[in-house]
């Protein structure tokens, strides 16, 4: 948590070959220059090993943000809209052909391992806006993962309370920024679909997928509001950390009122995740049959289940604080049911049968810990494993307490699930404001371009990114005859 998105890549494109601007002649050239920087940064990010991509993420975000004002300026000129009170006259000379590599579409999956998925061609600047903004939103989500990563690392000492709150606040801000972008794109895509009947080229930028990603970002941001003051995951991680030097632990303490509030927040996150899952699951039944990958659908379902399990845990904490240990254990049974954990009927707890079952569980935990240490696709189960560890700790504590002191009857969990209240929202989604060029920059682009646009000279495929230069002493046009067969020969 959050979802480990993969950033797309794109082909080279020259704005000057498809657009001309009478009012600001240098606008197409500047847009091509900014887009070329974005293309190179995305290509460099993709080729960097996964464990080292974090260092290049701020560069990708900054290049995307720098490119957006020029892209929106060209888009405004095509639709005859003013920017800062200044008219921009952009003329379409020929339909653009831009290639993007989708990362969420199920048809992007390839049968050959190690081969990149196929690209899709877009013939409208509108979908260029969609891909660039969705890429920026995905990058914001990856920045949220980067901020939360130190909270789950076990190879160093646990972070303090203040550092934990700072990390959660930074991640929440990035997720809310991503949700605002997704909401803007979803509204714009719905207008294209209903008003002009335009079908998206892939599922990544379809109205349903964009709305689902907005709901996903809101669900993850809502869960972070709970994680900020939830002491139990930190206690479980601290107990598993071998580098922890604390010899005295403070028992987790949650006020009764806040436990009920946290439960309703988790239910709100579960509702967002359920909406996202429903939208993505319905894509395959829509016209065209475009659908998202199974891994993304599985993550949405796990997030919905984990959020409901968290709500059951907080309802159980609320009951335990009120002296109703039997009801608290019943809430744990309901949460285990939501997590899909098998229960032993004789003991009522999570099934801990020895042999291969326990060995497989330990192997899964070690594999997830290695993913966290290396910074790979950790949290791909939407926090299900982490929540099951908290459940195990609470089950041992409450069952021992009920067997020795309280001796209360554990009621069935079915009626408790039917009495769960509605979720409560905590975040307000702010509308996304498209960035605009400032007046001095617009005024400077009234001058004619000082150079030609060389974006078309670069190959369109990011696999063949090495240009064949002229060999010294060779005749013009015979560069390929002197080319070595080694791909990366220097």
Swiss-Prot record:
Residues 342-362, 445-470 are annotated as: Disordered. GO terms for biological process: cellular response to pH. Residues 1-299 form the BRO1 domain. InterPro entries: BRO1_dom, BRO1_sf, pH-resp_palC. Disulfide bonds: none annotated. GO terms for cellular component: plasma membrane. Required for the proteolytic cleavage of the transcription factor pacc-1 in response to alkaline ambient pH. Belongs to the palC family. This is pH-response regulator protein palC. It comes from Neurospora crassa (strain ATCC 24698 / 74-OR23-1A / CBS 708.71 / DSM 1257 / FGSC 987). The gene is palc-1.
């Amino acid at each position: 948590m959050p979802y480990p998105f993969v950033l797309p890549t794109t082909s080279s494109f020259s704005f000057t070959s498809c657009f001309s601007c009478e009012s600001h002649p240098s606008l197409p050239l500047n847009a091509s220059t900014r887009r070329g920087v974005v293309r190179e940064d995305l290509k460099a990010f993709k080729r960097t090993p996964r464990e080292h991509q974090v260092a290049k993420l701020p560069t990708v975000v900054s290049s995307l943000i720098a490119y957006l004002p020029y892209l929106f300026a060209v888009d405004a000129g095509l639709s005859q809209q003013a920017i800062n009170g200044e008219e921009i006259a952009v003329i379409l000379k020929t339909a653009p052909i831009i290639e993007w590599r989708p990362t969420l579409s199920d048809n992007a999956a390839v049968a050959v391992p190690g081969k990149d998925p196929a690209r899709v061609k877009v013939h409208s600047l509108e979908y260029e806006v969609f891909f660039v903004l969705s890429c920026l939103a995905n990058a914001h989500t990856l920045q949220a993962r980067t901020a939360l990563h130190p909270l789950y690392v076990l190879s160093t000492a646990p972070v303090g309370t203040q550092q934990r709150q700072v990390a959660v606040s930074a991640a929440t801000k990035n997720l809310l920024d991503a949700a605002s972008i997704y909401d803007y794109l979803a509204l714009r895509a719905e207008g294209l679909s209903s008003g002009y009947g335009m079908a998206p080229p892939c599922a990544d930028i379809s109205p349903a997928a964009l709305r689902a990603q907005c709901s996903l970002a809101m669900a993850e941001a809502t869960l972070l509001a709970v994680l900020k003051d939830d002491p139990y995951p930190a206690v479980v991680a601290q107990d598993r950390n071998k580098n922890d030097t604390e010899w005295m632990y403070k028992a987790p303490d949650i006020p009764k009122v806040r436990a009920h509030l946290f439960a309703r927040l988790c239910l709100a996150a579960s509702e967002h995740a359920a909406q996202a899952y429903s939208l993505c699951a319905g894509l395959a039944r829509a016209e065209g049959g475009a659908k998202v990958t199974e891994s993304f659908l599985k993550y949405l379902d796990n997030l919905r289940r984990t959020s409901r399990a968290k709500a059951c845990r907080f309802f159980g904490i609320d009951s335990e604080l009120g002296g109703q240990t039997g009801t608290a254990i019943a809430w744990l049974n309901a949460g285990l049911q939501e997590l899909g954990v098998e229960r032993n009927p004789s003991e009522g707890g999570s099934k801990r049968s020895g042999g291969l079952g326990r060995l497989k569980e330990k192997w899964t935990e070690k594999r997830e810990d290695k993913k966290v240490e290396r910074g790979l696709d950790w949290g791909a189960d939407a926090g299900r494993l982490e929540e099951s560890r908290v459940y195990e700790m609470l089950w041992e504590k409450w069952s021992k307490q009920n067997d020795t002191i309280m001796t209360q009857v554990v009621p069935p969990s079915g009626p408790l699930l039917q009495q769960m209240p509605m979720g409560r929202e905590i975040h307000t989604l702010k509308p996304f404001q498209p960035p605009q060029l400032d007046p001095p920059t617009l005024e400077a682009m009234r001058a004619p371009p000082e150079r030609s646009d060389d974006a078309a000279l670069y190959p369109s495929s990011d696999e063949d990114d090495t240009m064949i230069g002229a060999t010294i002493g060779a005749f013009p046009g015979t560069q390929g005859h002197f080319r070595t067969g080694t791909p990366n020969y220097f």
